[in-house]
Amino acid sequence: MESMFEDDISILTQEALGPSEVWLDGPGDPSLGGDMCSASHFALITAYGDIKERLGGLERENATLRRRLKVYEIKYPLITDFGEEHGFPLYEIKDGSLLEVEKVSLQQRLNQFQHELQKNKEQEEQLGEMIQAYEKLCVEKSDLETELGEMRALVETHLRQICGLEKQLQQQQGLRDAAFSSLSPPAVPATACPDLDLHYLALRGGPALGHAGWPGPTSVSVSELERRRLEEALEAAQGEARGAQLREEQLQAECERLQGELKQLQETRAQDLASNQSECGMAWVKRVGDDQVNLALAYTELTEELGRLRELSSLQGRILRTLLQEQARNAGQRHSPLSQRHSPAPACPSPSPPARPPPCAPCQSPAAQRRSPVPPCPSPQQRRSPASPSCPSPVPQRRSPVPPSCQSPSPQRRSPVPPSCPAPQPRPPPPPGERTLAERAYAKPPSHHAKAGFQGRRSYSELAEGAAYAAASPAWLQAEAATLPKPRAYGGELYGPGRPLSPRRAFEGIRLRFEKQPSEEEEWAMPASPPSPEASTIRCASFCAGFPIPESPAATAYAHAEHAQSWPSINLLMETVGSDIRSCPLCQLGFPVGYPDDALIKHIDSHLENSKI
């Protein structure tokens, strides 16, 4: 487009017009003035130049836009509605190649600039090093200048001393000259006796004449002496300077030696500190190892104590179950006539739910009995309803929800419908010298043994052995003082989430003191039956059956057992050591003397936790 408007300005000039053509508003036209023609011509030329410049700028912008559009079309080809790609002519490909060439050239220039930048960085580093070296040289130069100034000051002092000595020498020489001049006599005229005068002059004026006429030997000797004296002073000053240099060298050597000793001392000190730190680290490791060994020994001892406690608990549970089964058989034999009267048809259906499994055999292990949903020992509900499931009961107001496996051993709480069992065979009481294994296991320990166990051991199950209580009397076995303790699971496995609900589980949250109530005695009492001589022992066994029995060590690991460590609970427990009946000092709940101390302390801990003490 620039070529189109390149020479169009010639149409406004006179040369572009033909010889026969004349401007309408030219200067030769008499109808228009000269000033007006020139002004209009200049305005037209200016406007045409502006228009041409604008058109050139627009053309350049259009070319740039076309070039960019071509680049975009090459990068992102357009697809028509018919699915065909838009074809580009050959000049567009040429423009792309030109762009590639420009890109390569720009990349080369960029690499060149980067190379120059790297060179500039290296030069800057070299310049920095040179500046540092120059600074070091400047520092050394300043040091040398200071040393030179000191030497100059020293030389000036020596020169001043030499000048002073020379002045003193000149003064002394002047004084000597004055003394010699005062000693010489004035001139005397000639006399008749010239020989005497000559002789006198020879005798008295010899030195003066010699001093005045020519330099005598005295002046020469004085100058020699002064020179020698000055040389000696100069040599002495040089010797002092050499001595000062030697002392300086000696002091420098001493300083270097002291610096070496200081470095050696620092190294030895660092080595000593490192060795001390290593020794301290080894001592700390040894101390930690000893602590771990002591902790492992204490853990082992505590595990053994807990194992012995669980073995004792399982032994007591087996003894209690065997005792309860014996008492149940005896009670069933005593109540058999009444059950035969009230249940003539023994094959009638039982009112209890048929989905209950049969009771477990008495010879099962403690673990199996704990897992069984129907425990062989009677619960408090079974004591309230001792009717056997195999016989129909005409009084259905007190039915047991779970069919018990044995009759309740309490004679004061007998059901009006006893089971079909043979006649009771009363057993005579045992002699006082013979003691059952249950009485030995639940005998009350002496108070001093219990206190010694609390003070000397971390595990409070030391006195749970049955042999330690063999000499104690079962004074706590009283029917009026029987209570039901709060059952607690050992390790969370006694009543797991997968175990079925048992009568003992139903009575977990109920604290019940089984005392004689008038309504119950009127309802359940049977005046025809004589009181059993073994009432206290049976009541003790049924009462102890409500306590949780810890599992054996083989059943669960020690990690599930919680050890009581609360000292307030221990102090509260120590208050009940000397009493006849072990009871909780907070809720007055009675416990057997042989009940584990750890479980009792945990019971007190539950009160303290609930009250947030």
UniProtKB/Swiss-Prot annotation:
The keyword Phosphoprotein applies. This is TANK-binding kinase 1-binding protein 1. The modification Phosphoserine is found at residues 184, 365, 372, 379, 385, 400, 415, 502, 532. PANTHER family: PROSAPIP2 PROTEIN/5-AZACYTIDINE INDUCED GENE 2, TANK-BINDING KINASE 1-BINDING PROTEIN 1. Residues 281-330 are annotated as: Interaction with TBK1 and IKBKE. Zn(2+) binds at residues 584, 587, 603, 607. Residues 328-457 are annotated as: Disordered. Residues 346-361, 389-406, 416-433 have a biased composition (Pro residues). Residues 48-162, 218-277 form a coiled coil. Homodimer. May form a heterodimer with NAP1. Interacts with TKB1 and IKBKE. Weakly interacts with DDX3X. It comes from the Eukaryota. GO terms for biological process: innate immune response. Residues 1-280 are annotated as: Homodimerization. One of its GO terms (cellular component) is cytoplasm. Keywords: Coiled coil, Immunity, Innate immunity, Metal-binding, Phosphoprotein, Zinc, Zinc-finger. Pfam families: TBD. A zinc finger (UBZ1-type) spans 581-607. Adapter protein which constitutively binds TBK1 and IKBKE playing a role in antiviral innate immunity. Essential for the efficient induction of IRF-dependent transcription following infection with Sendai virus. GO terms for molecular function: zinc ion binding. Residues 362-372 have a biased composition (Low complexity).
